[in-house]
């Protein structure tokens, strides 16, 4: 059954336009001028906006007004692409969320050439489908159900011949993550029908997910209907008016048969069948039937639930082969009534086997692109893939389709770059060659370049850099790093460069002033020996020593210096609008929301006057954040140190902390197992940096879920460094210190001995792992085993994985990934610190957990609702195709 756009454009839609929520919907009218306001579709009430903010290329036009076709407004305009081979839309989505993605194409002879275009459409780096509009006067649409692998979704139009790619509309709808689950791959729609003799298609607002349902009336069927209300509260949320009609065989003794042809022959298909009993049965009446697919019993003795939907679906895909596909509903001997069915969906599997480029590399290169407005025509879509469409000026390393490519060479020479060398460059984890030559970059050469272990060439020549080159970078040059710095007149490779430059001027001045200096010294000594010895009580503490009062002497300078922005208290009041919006409160004080430079959101942590350790922790945190920089550590924007007023200003993290998400206090959104792994991996990378990337290394001392903050893309960053301490390098790996931390997360060995090592952080991180696994309190006195470590150990001895896991996940996870995470967590919380892994090992094992989860062969199915049931695993080793 070919799905024509005509169904969506001229079919009579049964809709109730009103209070339905379009939250999470993306509805783009491709070609709508950017200065036109969003509008509501007259058929269904969906709000469409211009696509102009989601793509920077292409031109817009309108279909030929003389065409004799009736089109909805969003199909009257289009965007076409005369430049570049690949042009991509970049859309914000949530990683791990399942989406229904619909793209529509109406040529409409916009160019007057009467040449129907053909081209490819890609989803990320993978080809989705060949689009051929030959003979498609009314246009065509393609649907796919796809789980987002990152927080950005690229939909790309790829030119393959002489005609230009076009697009008319893009519609994206979030679905529940426990529906349309596959063993692997995404789902292309084959057909979606409801059994009725109606001629009306149904979509939003009747269908809250905006799935389009076409009526289907088989010649051997008849139909029954009801006006009674149907309970549609299962995960698939089938529209009630669809469930109020059903098909039964014309011959009550015959089976109800539905057939369709496979397309292609070996296509793998998932089938979803929705049933509801809509007739009132008498005491002596029963409706019971067997569900048979391709001659195999799939579910025997099935009886639909009265006025309530029940969904049967294939747990594994099927292949129908050349004979075609057929579904039989066969009345059992005990049944007095014929079988019925209300609606059916069939999807074919499409494997998107090529993983996207490394997410950290993608984030970094897109950040650079946006910051410097690098409008290169090839810089669209995935940077490295497909290989023949990779971005100019970069080179990537490729292993195989199951491994994400990484960027190994970046050439931004002669690109008009200005300002300082961007810190985001350190996100390129495998970068070998960096060319920033012949730009207008200013400021010092940053130390982080020396910490990028894979770099073998750095070309900074032809800029306006200044200051001294970091010694660590010069040391790496001696070890083989190619470092090109020529053409920076104010940059020097020696710490004595400023002295050398001024020698010619200073020497004659010093010579002529020597006698004057001698006279001044003699006079000064005379007065010094006459002066009374100063009383110790009149001496101020040296600048390196803080005074005991948090509101330290205003005549004394602050006990630290910072290159970060120092704000006055009045500026802090202004940025927080006089502290009108509190984000939370901790031991340090209240955290407020604010703005710097009008648009940059910040979080302002204001020291409470009652905080006994406040100034000490304040000083420690500023000094630490002044010298550490990592993508997984919260950045310090600035600070305030004015009399009794102390404040820390951080980057704003709009998604709060991990604890809020686990507890459901942040919008009620349940983090998937994949999302949880990515978050703790981010946190682990930040902690690994503190332990191994800092000089000297640092112990955080307060790792917990409330100190793991999430940005708008759910990227995790460690926060709250007030308790952090450095620890020695070399043989002596611990320091004696007063015990500090949070009960429940605190390392028992550290608590007993007062000896602090990086392994104390490992213990706390293990508790965090157990928290994201189980989503249970760290300490719960009502449990037989109150502490979470004891409780999980007890459950492991029972082999009770299901009781350990967060029930909100509904078993939607890879068992191997989960067990590996539990084993890792338990090794982290070993009572002996010597038996705990280091953070590098933790990072590697979390990566393995994540790989196992993202590539799992089979995923768990939601059985929370009794309105759905999967088919038996051992019936099928083949799958379905397409409808006719």
From Swiss-Prot:
Residues 1-19 form the signal peptide. Residues 577-850 form the Protein kinase domain. Belongs to the protein kinase superfamily. Ser/Thr protein kinase family. GO terms for cellular component: membrane. Binds to the ammonium transporter AMT1-1. Residues 535-559 are annotated as: Disordered. This is Probable leucine-rich repeat receptor-like protein kinase At2g28990. It catalyses: L-seryl-[protein] + ATP = O-phospho-L-seryl-[protein] + ADP + H(+); L-threonyl-[protein] + ATP = O-phospho-L-threonyl-[protein] + ADP + H(+). The active site is at 702 (proton acceptor). Glycans are attached at residues 70, 177, 217, 231, 251, 284, 298, 334, 418, 427, 438, 459, 464. Residues 530-884 are cytoplasmic. One of its GO terms (molecular function) is protein serine/threonine kinase activity. Residues 546-559 have a biased composition (Polar residues). Residues 20-508 are extracellular. InterPro entries: Kinase-like_dom_sf, Leu-rich_rpt, LRR_dom_sf, Malectin-like_Carb-bd_dom, Prot_kinase_dom, Protein_kinase_ATP_BS, Ser/Thr_kinase_AS. The modification Phosphoserine is found at residue 736. The modification Phosphotyrosine is found at residues 650, 750. Its main location: membrane. LRR repeats lie at residues 404-427, 428-451, 452-476. It comes from the Eukaryota. Keywords: ATP-binding, Glycoprotein, Kinase, Leucine-rich repeat, Membrane, Nucleotide-binding, Phosphoprotein, Receptor, Repeat, Serine/threonine-protein kinase, Signal, Transferase, Transmembrane, Transmembrane helix. The modification Phosphothreonine is found at residues 568, 737, 742. It is a single-pass type I membrane protein. Its EC number is 2.7.11.1. It is found in: Membrane. The chain crosses the membrane at residues 509-529.
């Amino acid at each position: 059954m070919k799905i024509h756009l005509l169904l969506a454009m001229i079919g009579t839609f049964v809709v109730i336009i009103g209070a339905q929520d379009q939250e999470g919907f993306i509805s783009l009218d491709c070609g709508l001028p950017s200065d036109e306001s969003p509008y509501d579709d007259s058929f269904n009430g969906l709000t469409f906006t211009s696509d102009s903010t989601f793509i920077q290329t292409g031109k817009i036009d309108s279909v030929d007004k003389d065409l004799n076709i009736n089109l909805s407004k969003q199909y009257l305009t289009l965007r076409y692409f005369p430049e570049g081979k690949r042009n991509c839309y970049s859309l914000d989505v949530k990683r791990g969320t399942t989406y229904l993605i619909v793209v529509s194409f109406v040529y409409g002879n916009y160019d007057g050439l009467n040449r129907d275009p053909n081209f490819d459409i890609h989803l990320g780096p993978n080809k989705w489908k060949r689009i051929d509009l030959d003979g498609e006067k009314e246009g065509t649409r393609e649907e796919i159900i796809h789980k987002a692998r990152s927080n950005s979704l690229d939909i790309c139009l790829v030119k393959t011949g002489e005609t230009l790619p076009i697009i008319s509309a893009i519609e994206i709808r979030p679905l529940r993550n426990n529906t349309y689950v596959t063993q692997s791959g995404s789902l292309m729609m084959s057909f979606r029908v409801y059994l009725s003799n109606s001629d009306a298609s149904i979509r939003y607002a009747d269908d809250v997910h905006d799935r389009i349902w076409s009526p289907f009336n088989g010649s051997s069927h008849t139909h029954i209907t009801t006006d009674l209300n149907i309970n549609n509260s299962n995960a698939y949320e089938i529209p009630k008016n669809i469930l109020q009609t059903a098909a039964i065989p014309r011959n009550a003794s015959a089976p109800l048969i539905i057939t369709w042809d496979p397309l292609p022959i070996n296509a793998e298909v998932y089938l979803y069948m929705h049933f509801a009993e809509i007739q009132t049965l008498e005491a002596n009446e029963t409706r019971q039937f067997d569900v048979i697919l391709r001659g195999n019993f799939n579910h025997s003795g099935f009886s639909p639930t009265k006025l309530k939907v029940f969904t049967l679906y294939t747990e594994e895909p099927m292949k129908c082969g050349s004979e075609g596909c057929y579904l039989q509903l066969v009345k059992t001997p005990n049944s007095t009534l014929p079988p019925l069915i209300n609606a059916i969906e069939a999807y074919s599997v499409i494997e998107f086997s090529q993983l996207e480029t490394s997410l950290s590399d993608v984030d970094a290169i897109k950040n650079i692109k946006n910051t410097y407005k690098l409008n290169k025509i090839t810089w669209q879509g995935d940077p490295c893939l497909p290989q023949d469409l990779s971005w100019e000026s970069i080179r990537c390393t490729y292993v195989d389709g199951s491994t994400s490519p990484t960027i190994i060479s970046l050439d931004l020479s002669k690109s008009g770059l200005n300002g300082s060398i961007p810190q985001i460059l350190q996100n390129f984890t495998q970068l070998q060659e960096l060319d920033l030559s012949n730009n207008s970059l200013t400021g010092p050469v940053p130390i982080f370049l020396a910490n990028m272990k894979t770099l073998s060439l750095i070309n900074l020549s032809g800029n306006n850099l200044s200051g001294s080159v970091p010694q660590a970078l010069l040391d790496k040059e001696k070890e083989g790093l190619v470092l090109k710095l020529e053409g920076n007149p104010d940059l020097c490779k020696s710490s004595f460069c400023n002295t050398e430059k001024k020698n010619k001027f200073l020497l004659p001045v010093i010579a002529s002033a020597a006698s004057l200096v001698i006279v001044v010294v003699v006079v000064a000594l005379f007065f010094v020996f006459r002066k009374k010895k100063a009383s110790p009580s009149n001496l101020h503490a040296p600048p390196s020593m803080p005074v005991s009062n948090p509101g330290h002497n205003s005549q004394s300078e602050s006990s630290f210096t910072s290159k970060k922005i120092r704000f006055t208290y009045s500026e802090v009041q202004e940025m927080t609008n006089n502290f009108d919006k509190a984000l939370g409160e901790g031991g340090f004080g209240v955290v407020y929301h604010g703005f710097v430079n009008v648009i940059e959101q910040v979080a302002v942590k204001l020291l409470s006057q009652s905080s006994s350790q406040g100034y000490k922790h304040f000083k420690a945190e500023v000094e630490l954040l002044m010298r550490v920089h990592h993508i997984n550590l919260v950045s310090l924007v600035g600070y305030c140190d004015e009399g009794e007023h102390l404040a820390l200003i951080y980057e704003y993290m709009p998604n709060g902390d991990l604890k809020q998400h686990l507890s459901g206090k942040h919008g009620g959104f349940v983090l998937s197992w994949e999302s949880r792994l990515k978050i703790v991996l981010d946190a682990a990378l930040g902690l690994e940096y503190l332990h191994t990337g800092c000089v000297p290394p640092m112990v955080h001392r307060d790792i917990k879920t409330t100190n793991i903050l999430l940005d708008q893309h759910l990227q995790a960053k460690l926060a709250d460094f007030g308790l952090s301490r450095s620890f020695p390098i070399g043989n002596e790996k611990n320091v004696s210190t007063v015990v500090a931390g949070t009960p429940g997360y605190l390392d028992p060995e550290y608590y007993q001995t007062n000896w602090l090592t990086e392994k104390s952080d490992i213990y706390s991180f293990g508790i965090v792992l157990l928290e994201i696994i189980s989503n249970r309190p760290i300490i719960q006195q009502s449990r037989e085993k109150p502490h979470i470590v004891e409780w999980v150990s007890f459950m492991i001895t029972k082999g009770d994985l299901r009781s350990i896991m967060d029930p909100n996940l509904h078993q939607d996870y890879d068992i191997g990934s989960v067990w590996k995470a539990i084993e890792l967590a338990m090794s982290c919380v070993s009572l002996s610190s010597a038996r705990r892994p280091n953070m590098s090992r933790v990072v590697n094992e979390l990566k393995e957990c994540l790989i196992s989860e993202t590539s799992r062969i089979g995923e768990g199915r939601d059985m929370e609702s009794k309105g759905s049931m999967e088919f038996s695993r051992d019936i099928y080793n083949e799958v379905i195709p397409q409808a006719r």
